[in-house]
Amino acid sequence: MPVEWLLIPFAYLLGSVSSAVIVSRTLGLPDPRQEGSKNPGATNVLRLGGKRAAILTLLGDASKGLIPLLIAKSMAVSPPLFAAIGFAAFVGHLYPVFFQFKGGKGVATALGVLLGFAWPVGLMALLTWIGVAALFRFSSLSALAAAVLAPVYVWLWLGSAELVVATLFMSMLLVYRHKGNIERLLKGEEARLGAKRL
């Protein structure tokens, strides 16, 4: 097996590391899997521990998607393998082997993957999130909007079928992981950014 193929399991294992759990334990915060929304992600950590903890979680989760792709770029892997490596990191965050396959929703890790595909694509997705969040104050709605538009951004900027397909699958999984949020949005019960979830 060519050594570059080992980047797929490496990306998955790195994705399986929970930044939210590590940051929360380090800072003496409640376990985000047990408190708040019970999602080990930056938004829940923001509610439980404030901005510093949330930023550290966001950077950690995004790095999980970015680092394997930076390594892959340095090895000049093929486009299909490059796409698979990014997708593996994302899946690792959603279904982590270290946490009984119960992970987060994948927003920050998906951002890291998109930045790894091409930084302008990641930037466009991030600006989409920021714009929707500024208008509506819902983290989940912002993530859903960015997820829907991400494959379009990849196609327009890169034109790579492999990367578009990988991004489509990431987007579908991300929307699926937000099904509870979608239900609450439709009922008018979703917590806004800055609100404490009881």
Swiss-Prot record:
GO terms for cellular component: plasma membrane. GO terms for biological process: phospholipid biosynthetic process. This is Glycerol-3-phosphate acyltransferase. Catalyzes the transfer of an acyl group from acyl-phosphate (acyl-PO(4)) to glycerol-3-phosphate (G3P) to form lysophosphatidic acid (LPA). This enzyme utilizes acyl-phosphate as fatty acyl donor, but not acyl-CoA or acyl-ACP. Its main location: membrane. The chain crosses the membrane at residues 3-23, 81-101, 113-133, 153-175. The keyword Membrane applies. InterPro entries: G3P_acylTferase_PlsY (IPR003811). GO terms for molecular function: acyl-phosphate glycerol-3-phosphate acyltransferase activity.
